[in-house]
Amino acid sequence: AVLLPFLDGQPDWASFVAEIRWQQAAADHYGVELVPVLNADTGYIFDLDDRMYAEVLRQLRLAFPDLRFIAGITARGAQDDTTFKAERYRALLDLVQAHDNCEVMIMTSKGLNTLDPERRRDGYYQIAEWLIRPGIVHALEPAFVPWATPYEPWLLHQLAIHPKFVGGKVSTLDEPHFLYWAAMCKDLKLDFAPHSGDDYG
């Protein structure tokens, strides 16, 4: 995850680029693949307007024309909604998919998270109809926000078998959900990559 640095109240683009160059150099040194994640929680996705969100992607492409990246998207303008509306994700989705060589991380939202498992599955599937880039689903546990719930095994399986979802990210502090995900994907031979930070560790 790339931290969007600020200086005097504005994004510090030189430090942003330097951070990614340092990460890439470290990955190259150790012989591992590193794909930067932009505009997620460390990128202040919930605080960026659409113009600044797009500018982060533009600045990355100016400095790294061929680098694969992952960008988080969330529901825009949903704070007063009483029902889940998949189209709230469309604005940021379109900004990401204007770029090549990227993946879209569909970050959870209160409206999506509070649905029962079957309707939650349907909500993700609705968003997937607009995907032209590979999709990654995202879950939180309630240690982060009180309304969050990790995926039940049935829901994880339903998302993992969707052809447009290549993986899933779970953010955990209290439970080893990432290990549950990895075990299910391995045992069922699912073509779906579990992702996690080191939150639980």
Question: What is each PLM-predicted segment?
Answer:
Residues 1-150:
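Active-site beta->alpha loop and helix N-cap motifs at the rims of alpha/beta catalytic domains
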Residues 130-137, 141-201:
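Catalytic alpha/beta core domains of metabolic enzymes, predominantly
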